[in-house]
């Protein structure tokens, strides 16, 4: 797959509107108390110690959270004081909840004014972050949240801004910029500017330009927060240019970004043997939900169809389908209506489904970053999971070696039998 195609696949980034949205890293799935790990329930303090609004604490209790994760423990006390934050922490650690709770805590809603702007690089992620805001603002009825991204009519967005102006806007840079340029979206009252999966937006020059133009439309005095699972040393200075003396938090070194509780294996086979092997594994493995990653839209459609024909309850998500259809299918999978999802990289970054406990790389990801974000779909927030990667040629083997070197992890060949308790939580 050409590099250009990969970018299109990942970002679905279009020239006329920068319409991409980043991912909620999921303040979902409460930590299981019996799981040992560096970040699960390691702090005896609860969310109450942050002195959050009672309305927020009620929503947190409703979501089933008791103890903040390490990244939440490190970031929230400073973030709620309005400090700029630059944070890297591995997938599944609840980064989304940091900025959602910090901005809701500080928000003083003013009718007709947008106070919070959150941008991310994929539409699905924008949608998910907006849902997190709705979840945590459950007992704050005056707070309005809206999500704007390309692929849907801009007229509807303009209508929302005119008739029911939100206090919190989540969106992708292209659509946000289009709305700001045509004066539908007024950014003069922004108090909190957040980039989620910031490296994806700032590494690409065209998207970075859009973010910079939007940034210049906001007031000088504001809080800036940026989050990502991967922040290279090269991109950090770029992030800092947007900030004033930020608090920098890097939870776990880059080489330790692999996930606690996630079993990782590979299977060596020919390309034409993948289907049979996949069906065999789906037959013998125990799973709640599974995500299968493929490299193209065509393979995504064909494999999903094949799985259904073999009586596996599969659903596909890819960039070739209309936006409404994509979001509807994402919601179906999240609501457990289907247990198997076949997806392109479009789904790979930041999307949070807490029941997924197995991720398959049917096709090898193009680099170690993509590998991390794909396998992070299983084993979210300290729960157990299994990642199985199909290796069918020398290039696949090279990428797998890169992954092992970079993250200092040993990925071994899939054994004939796997202990079920190593990749699925046992119900008590």
From Swiss-Prot:
Residues covered by the Helicase C-terminal domain: 261-422
Covalent link Glycyl lysine isopeptide (Lys-Gly) (interchain with G-Cter in SUMO2), residues: 36
Region (Disordered): 1-31
Residue list for modification Phosphoserine: 38, 41
Motif DECD box positions after renumbering to this chain: 196-199
Domain Helicase ATP-binding residues, every copy: 76-249
CDD domains xrefs: DEADc_DDX39, SF2_C_DEAD
Sites bearing N-acetylalanine, chain numbering: 2
Matches recorded under SMART domains: DEXDc (SM00487), HELICc (SM00490)
Residue stretches of biased makeup (Acidic residues): 1-19
Residues annotated as binding ATP: 89-96
TM region(s), chain numbering: none
Job of this protein: Involved in nuclear export of spliced and unspliced mRNA. Component of the TREX complex which is thought to couple mRNA transcription, processing and nuclear export, and specifically associates with spliced mRNA and not with unspliced pre-mRNA. The TREX complex is recruited to spliced mRNAs by a transcription-independent mechanism, binds to mRNA upstream of the exon-junction complex (EJC) and is recruited in a splicing- and cap-dependent manner to a region near the 5' end of the mRNA where it functions in mRNA export to the cytoplasm via the TAP/NXF1 pathway. Splice factor that is required for the first ATP-dependent step in spliceosome assembly and for the interaction of U2 snRNP with the branchpoint. Has both RNA-stimulated ATP binding/hydrolysis activity and ATP-dependent RNA unwinding activity. Even with the stimulation of RNA, the ATPase activity is weak. Can only hydrolyze ATP but not other NTPs. The RNA stimulation of ATPase activity does not have a strong preference for the sequence and length of the RNA. However, ssRNA stimulates the ATPase activity much more strongly than dsRNA.
Family: Belongs to the DEAD box helicase family. DECD subfamily.
Protein name, per record: Spliceosome RNA helicase DDX39B
Organism, as annotated: Bos taurus (Bovine)
Species classification: Eukaryota, Metazoa, Chordata, Craniata, Vertebrata
């Amino acid at each position: 797959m050409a590099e250009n195609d990969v970018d299109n696949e990942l970002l679905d980034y279009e020239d006329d509107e920068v319409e991409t949205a980043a991912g909620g890293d999921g303040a979902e799935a409460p930590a299981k108390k019996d799981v040992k790990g560096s970040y699960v329930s390691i702090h005896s303090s609860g969310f109450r110690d942050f002195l959050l609004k009672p309305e927020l604490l009620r929503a947190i209790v409703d979501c089933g959270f008791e103890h903040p994760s390490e990244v939440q423990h490190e970031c929230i006390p400073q973030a709620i004081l309005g400090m700029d934050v630059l944070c890297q922490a591995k997938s599944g650690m609840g980064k989304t909840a940091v900025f959602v709770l910090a901005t809701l805590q500080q928000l003083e809603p003013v009718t007709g004014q947008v106070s919070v702007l959150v941008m991310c690089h994929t539409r699905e992620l924008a949608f998910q972050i907006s849902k997190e805001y709705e979840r945590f603002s459950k007992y704050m009825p005056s707070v309005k949240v809206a999500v704007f991204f390309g692929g849907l009519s801009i007229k509807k967005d303009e209508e929302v801004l005119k008739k029911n102006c939100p206090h919190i806007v989540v969106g992708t840079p292209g659509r946000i910029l289009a709305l700001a340029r045509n004066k539908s979206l007024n950014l003069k009252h922004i108090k909190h500017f957040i980039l989620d999966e910031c490296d994806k937006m700032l590494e690409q020059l065209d998207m970075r330009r859009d973010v910079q133009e939007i940034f210049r439309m906001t007031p000088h005095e504001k809080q800036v927060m940026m989050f990502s699972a991967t922040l290279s040393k090269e991109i950090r200075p770029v992030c800092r240019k947007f900030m004033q003396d930020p608090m920098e938090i890097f939870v776990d070194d880059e080489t330790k970004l692999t996930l606690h509780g996630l079993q990782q294996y590979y299977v060596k086979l020919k390309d034409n043997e993948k289907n049979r092997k996949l069906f065999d594994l789906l037959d013998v493995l125990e799973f709640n939900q599974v995500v299968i990653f493929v490299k193209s839209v065509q393979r995504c459609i064909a494999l999903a169809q094949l799985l259904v024909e073999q009586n596996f309850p599969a659903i596909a998500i890819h960039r070739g389908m209309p936006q409404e259809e994509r979001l509807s299918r994402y919601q179906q999978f999240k609501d457990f209506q289907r247990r198997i999802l076949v997806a392109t990289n479009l789904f790979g970054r930041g999307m949070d489904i807490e029941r997924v406990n197995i991720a398959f790389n049917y096709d090898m990801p193009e680099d170690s970053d993509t590998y991390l974000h794909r396998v992070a779909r299983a084993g979210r927030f300290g729960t157990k999971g299994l990642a199985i990667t199909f290796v069918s040629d020398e290039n696949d083997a090279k990428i797998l070696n890169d992954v092992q070197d970079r993250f200092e992890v040993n990925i071994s060949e899939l054994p004939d039998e796997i202990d079920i308790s190593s990749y699925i939580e046992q119900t008590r």
